[in-house]
C-alpha cells in the first residue's frame, strides 16, 4: 500500500497533505473502518466524535491523525485504505495511484440503487461462496468421517492381529509346556521301565536262587534217603546175623566132627596093619567112594556157593544200580517238576506282563483318543471362536459401511438442500425487482427498527443470517422428510418467502446506511468545496 517502511517517513510524507486532509475528511465516516482495522479503539473514537472540546470538524480530523500517527505504519496503511474506500480522489492526490476500490465512485455514478444492487450481488456471491465452502466443509467432514471409519477398521484389524498374535504366543507356550510335560512323562516312563526291568531281573535272580536252594534241598533229601536205606540194610544184615547159641552149637558140632575125624584117623592108622584083609579093602573102597562123593559134593557146594556169591554180588550191584537209578529218576522228576513250576511261573508272569502290556496299551490308546478328541474339540472351539470373531468383524465392518453410507447420504441430502437454496436464490434474482421497490415503503418502519437493533451484528458477521436461514431450512427439511403429507410446492413457497423477507430486511438496512452515509458525504463535500474555495 505504501512505499515507506519507516513510521516517520510514512507520516512525514503525509504532512504536506495535512491541510487538504483536514479540510476534506469527515471523521465519522472513516472511524468505523479504522476501528475495524483495530488501529482505533472505542475510547479514541469516543474522544474524536463526542469530545465537547472538539466541535470543529477540522480539529477532530487533526486529533484523529495524531492518534493514527501514534499507531505507526499499521495506522498509516489503514488510513490510506480508508481514503481509498471513501475518498478516492483524495487518495489519488496523496499517493498518485488509482484506487482499486470504487464504492464512492459507484455512489456518485449510479446512485444508491446501484450500490444496493452491487451490495446484493456481492452478498449473493458471498452466500454462494459460503454455500460452496459449507458443501466443501461437509464433504471434508464426510471424508474425515470415512477416514475415521477406516481408522476404526484398521484399529479393529490391528486389535484382531494383536489378539491372534497373543493367542499364537499362548498356543506356542502351551505347546512348549505340553512338550515339556510329554518329555517329563517319557523320562518318568523310561525310569519306571528301567526300574521294572531291574525288579524283574532281581526277581529272576531270586527265583534262580530259590530254585537252586530247592534243588540242593532235594539233593540233601535224596542223600538222606540213600543213607537211610543203607542204614536199614545194615540193620537188616545185623538182624539176619546168627545168634550166639547157634554159634556155640556149630562150634560143638565142629569139635565133635574134629574128634571123630581124629578117631577115624587113628582107626585108619591102626587099620593100616590090617590093610591086606578083604574087609579092610572093602571099607577102604567104601571110604574112597564116600570121600570121592564127599569131594564132589564139596566141590558142588563150593561152586554153588561161588555162584551164590556171584548172584548175591550181582543182585547187590543191581540193587545199588536200581537204587541209583531210582534216585536219579526221582531227582529228574523233581527237576522236571521244578522246571515245570518255573516254566509255569514264567508263563504266568508273561501272561501277567502281557495283560499289563495290553492294559497299558489300552490305556495309552484311550489317552491318545482322549487327547485327540480334546485337540479336535479345541480346534473346533478355536474355529468357532475364529468364525465368531470374523462374523463380529464383518458385522462391525457392515456397521461402519452403513455409517459411511449414512454419512454420504446425509452429505448428499445437505448438498441437495444447498442446491435447492441456490436454485431458490437464482429464482429470486431472476424475478423483477419492482415488486421489492413497491414493497419497500410498506415495511420501512419495521425494517428500520430491526436494522437499528441488528446493524452491529450484520457488520460483524454478514454470513450469519444466511447460516441461520440455512439451519432453519435444514431443520424444516429434516422435519418434512419423515412426514410426506406436505407438498414440495408449499415447502418451496415457505423457503422463498423466508428468503425474500431476509433479502428485503437486508436491503432496507443497507439502504438506510447508504442514505445516512450519502447525506454525510454530501454535507462534507459541500463543506470541503467551500473550504477549498476559501483556501484558494
UniProtKB/Swiss-Prot annotation:
A Gene Ontology molecular function term of the record: signaling adaptor activity
Listed Basic and acidic residues bias regions: 487-502
Xref: Pfam families: CARD
Cellular component, GO, one term: protein-containing complex
Compartmental location: Cytoplasm
Domain CARD residue range list: 6-98
Coiled-coil stretches: 117-277, 303-420
InterPro entries associated with the record: CARD, CARD_CARD9, DEATH-like_dom_sf
Result when mutating residue 533 to A: Abolished phosphorylation by CK2 and increased activation of NF-kappa-B
Post-translational modifications reported in the UniProt record: Phosphorylated at Thr-231 by PRKCD downstream of C-type lectin receptors activation: phosphorylation promotes interaction with BCL10, followed by activation of NF-kappa-B and MAP kinase p38 pathways. Phosphorylated at Thr-531 and Thr-533 by CK2 following interaction with VHL, leading to inhibit the ability to activate NF-kappa-B. Ubiquitinated at Lys-125 via 'Lys-27'-linked ubiquitin by TRIM62 downstream of C-type lectin receptors activation; leading to CARD9 activation, followed by activation of NF-kappa-B and MAP kinase p38 pathways. Deubiquitinated at Lys-125 by USP15, inhibiting CARD9.
Summary of activators and inhibitors of this protein: Maintained in an autoinhibited state via homodimerization in which the CARD domain forms an extensive interaction with the adjacent linker and coiled-coil regions. Activation downstream of C-type lectin receptors, by phosphorylation by PRKCD and/or ubiquitination by TRIM62, triggers disruption of the CARD domain-coiled coil interface, CARD9 homooligomerization and BCL10 recruitment, followed by activation of NF-kappa-B and MAP kinase p38 pathways. Zinc-binding inhibits activation by stabilizing the CARD ground-state conformation and restricting its capacity to form BCL10-nucleating filaments.
Annotated Zn(2+) binding sites: 3, 10, 73
Positions bearing Phosphothreonine: 231, 531, 533
Residues annotated with Phosphoserine modification: 2, 277, 424-425, 431, 451, 461, 483, 498
Keyword Cytoplasm belongs to the record: yes
Region described as Disordered: 425-451, 472-536
Cross-linked sites for Glycyl lysine isopeptide (Lys-Gly) (interchain with G-Cter in ubiquitin): 125
Keywords: Adaptive immunity, Coiled coil, Cytoplasm, Immunity, Innate immunity, Isopeptide bond, Metal-binding, Phosphoprotein, Ubl conjugation, Zinc
Renumbered residue ranges of the record's region Linker: 99-116
GO BP field: antifungal innate immune response; apoptotic signaling pathway; defense response to Gram-positive bacterium; defense response to virus; host-mediated regulation of intestinal microbiota composition; immunoglobulin mediated immune response; JNK cascade; neutrophil mediated immunity
Domain observations: The linker region, also named autoinhibitory interface, is required to prevent constitutive activation and maintain CARD9 in an autoinhibitory state. Disruption of this region triggers polymerization and activation, leading to formation of BCL10-nucleating filaments.
Function: Adapter protein that plays a key role in innate immune response against fungi by forming signaling complexes downstream of C-type lectin receptors. CARD9-mediated signals are essential for antifungal immunity against a subset of fungi from the phylum Ascomycota. Transduces signals in myeloid cells downstream of C-type lectin receptors CLEC7A (dectin-1), CLEC6A (dectin-2) and CLEC4E (Mincle), which detect pathogen-associated molecular pattern metabolites (PAMPs), such as fungal carbohydrates, and trigger CARD9 activation.
Subunit annotation: Monomer. Homodimer; homodimerization is mediated by the CARD domain which forms an extensive interaction with the adjacent linker and coiled-coil regions; leads to an autoinhibited state. Homomultimer; polymerizes following activation, forming a nucleating helical template that seeds BCL10-filament formation via a CARD-CARD interaction. Interacts (via CARD domain) with BCL10 (via CARD domain); interaction takes place following CARD9 activation and polymerization, leading to the formation of a filamentous CBM complex assembly.
Protein name: Caspase recruitment domain-containing protein 9
Phylogenetic placement of the source organism: Eukaryota, Metazoa, Chordata, Craniata, Vertebrata
Gene: Card9
